[in-house]
Amino acid sequence: MNSVLSHRLMRPLAAAFVGVITPLAFAPYQFWPLALLSPFILLLLLHQQSAKRAALIAYLWGIGQFAVGISWVHVSIDTFGGMPKIASLFLMTLLVGYLALYPSLFGWLLNRLFPNNSRSKWLCAAPALWLITDWLRGWVMTGFPWLWLGYSQIDSPLANFAPIGGVELITLLLLFCAGSLAYAVLNRRWLMACIPLVVYATGYGLQAMQWVTPQTERTASLALIQGNIEQGLKWLPSQRWPTIMKYTDLTRENWDADVIIWPEAAIPAFEYEISSFLHNLDAAARMNQSAVITGIINQSDDKQYFNSVLTVGDTPHGEYRYDLTQRYHKYHLLPFGEFVPFEEILRPLAPFFNLPMSSFSQGAYVQPNLIAKGFAFVTALCYEIIFNEQVRDNVTPDTDFLLTLSNDAWFGRSIGPLQHMEIARMRALELGKPLIRATNNGVTAVTDERGRIMAQLPQFETGVLKATVTPTRGSTPYFLWGTTPLYLWVGLAAGFAFWRQRRAR
């Protein structure tokens, strides 16, 4: 292999190619074995390279992965950013280049701290360092934990580890398997190549575990409204009431549902502007013994703006009244979409930095469950569903469902909304709670507590998804402990590998 890769450009080019094909492991392609093959090849390419060289190789792997895997971001920048194509491509290049720094850091740390070809390097250090750099990517500058390798395994046997340690545990196991294969190939210890078989077989066996129990005596009939409102028209004043009446008409046909759910910011107006309409909607819902959950925009007395969710109809609060303390307010805001860092500098530069509804304030990190028709919903608005610890910290023993409202119309007919749905499915599996996802134009769907899609609407069509969903009782290990055991393992594994490295010297 070294002879094939002896030319100084071969390893970086090979890494870039492997990075490019890595997104095929994720939705909509879901060729999940690539999520094991890709880091395995990357580890081989890093072998016997200087730390500086390893950083370059891993950086190009990251460039390939993110240039393809998050290409959908450019759809939003190019379509709604109001800037020349060259400028939108430049911004996209900056984003991809930034995200690739994290794989680069992994490569540098691995070969700087562990230059030898040892078993502890491949089986302990590599998985630990990968997880550390993933965590950093999910935290720095509000975080962007998209394309974590574990998400690709939602339909593989490894998915059954999610209720134990979340998506991070799956990522850790992928790197553990990749490291064992790298060690086997580099040292001709072929027995080590059996480790992935054992790990996947264990995952398959875990399918029999029943972490939670369906409450068959309690079922909720739901109607999810997919309005399919064109993003370019959504915030035009002339389209406000046509949009609201479209959702109202679709709702009127489905008052037999326990809970009717509209998507994120389905009502393109501030709540205080349409209080009469909401009073009427509340009265109609209560008359039909139903409840409506909808996304809406709010403004507080001190002129702070919130991306909110409200419930009307059969709720514990009685008749509708304008009270912001009884709303869910989005906590994790999307940079440049819902708030603009350094806005005094950036907003004058281009329309992209001055999009509609891009001056929001944060809600609280932990908020009460929304109650509708006696069911408790943990809410995550759009981007928030990718932050697993935030969702987990809002779940209580009384939570019935995970609810995520979104508007992915920003990203057109790209792979982004399908990746988004894949991530949402993982939240259901981790926490053992059915997930309800209502969107403007897809993917609108309902999953069971194992993240399996039970019902789904076609994308880019107006429609109503009717489904009966059963809540669960009980707790998964991940709900009880979160990622704390993984933090401990990473610290111990990295420390052990470093100790072995020093001892070998």
Swiss-Prot record:
Pathway: Protein modification; lipoprotein biosynthesis (N-acyl transfer). Residues 225-471 form the CN hydrolase domain. InterPro entries: Apolipo_AcylTrfase, C-N_Hydrolase, C-N_Hydrolase_sf, LNT_N. It is an enzyme of class 2 (transferase). It is found in: Cell inner membrane. It is a multi-pass membrane protein. The keyword Oxidoreductase does not apply. Pfam families: CN_hydrolase, LNT_N. The chain crosses the membrane at residues 15-46, 55-75, 89-109, 129-149, 161-181, 192-212, 479-499. The active site is at 264 (proton acceptor), 330, 382 (nucleophile). GO terms for molecular function: N-acyltransferase activity. Disulfide bonds: none annotated. Keywords: Acyltransferase, Cell inner membrane, Cell membrane, Membrane, Transferase, Transmembrane, Transmembrane helix. One of its GO terms (cellular component) is plasma membrane. Its main location: membrane. One of its GO terms (biological process) is lipoprotein biosynthetic process. NCBIfam families: lnt. Belongs to the CN hydrolase family. Apolipoprotein N-acyltransferase subfamily. Catalyzes the phospholipid dependent N-acylation of the N-terminal cysteine of apolipoprotein, the last step in lipoprotein maturation. This is Apolipoprotein N-acyltransferase. It comes from Vibrio cholerae serotype O1 (strain ATCC 39315 / El Tor Inaba N16961).
